[in-house]
Every structure is written in C-alpha cells, then in structure tokens.
Amino acid sequence: MARVTVEDCVDKVPNRFELVMLAAHRAREISAGSAPTVNRDNDKNPAVSLREIAEETQSADDLRERLIESNQHQIEVDEPEEDAMALLMGAEQDKPEEDSMSEEMLLRQLMAAQGQG
C-alpha cells in the first residue's frame, strides 16, 4: 500500500484547495457506487481518489466539470396565471363597492343629518 500525499498530486492540480475539493468530490462519487479506476489496496475512498488524481486515471478537468455540475441546482417555480394571481392577492376585495346613491340623494341626507333640511 503506497502512501499518497498531497505533494504527489500538486503537479496535476496546482491549487491545494482545489485539489482537496476535487478529491473529496471523487471520494463521494466512489461512496455513491462509482467504480475506482485504481486498485483499492484496502485504502479508504479519499486515499483512492488522491491516487486516481496522482496517477491521472481521473482527469482534473473532468473532475472539475463534474464537481461544478453537482453543485448546480435548477429550481422550477410554478407561477400562477395573471388572472389567478390577482384573485390570490385579493385584488377583487380592494375595489370599492358600487354606490347606488346619487349625489343629490347624498347631499339631501347630509343636510338632513346636520339639521338643515
């Protein structure tokens, strides 16, 4: 069982932080059932993924693309129709009620209420 360190992989992926992200993603893929491309040699998934990167059986560019795709989420929003949206928001309730009273009738009632009529 050969010991794999980050230094073995730095020439393939120069940024150590990116290397850790790629190796962790590949380890998750192996845990999910993807077949390792190197002999396991009783190693755990993170060590196997680092060996795959060091031996270039997994391309860093391919791993990077798969990592990006796994983090992209599409959220579908089911928006209601415009007419239904107005009803849902209570637009019908905001309309004033129709008055059957004319201006003349309103003035007469106001004057009567004030005692002038």
From Swiss-Prot:
Reactions catalysed, as given in the entry: RNA(n) + a ribonucleoside 5'-triphosphate = RNA(n+1) + diphosphate
Gene designation per UniProt: rpoZ
Record carries keyword Ligase: no
Enzyme Commission number, as recorded: 2.7.7.6
GO BP term (any one): DNA-templated transcription
Keywords: DNA-directed RNA polymerase, Nucleotidyltransferase, Transcription, Transferase
Protein name, per record: DNA-directed RNA polymerase subunit omega
GO terms assigned for molecular function: DNA binding; DNA-directed RNA polymerase activity
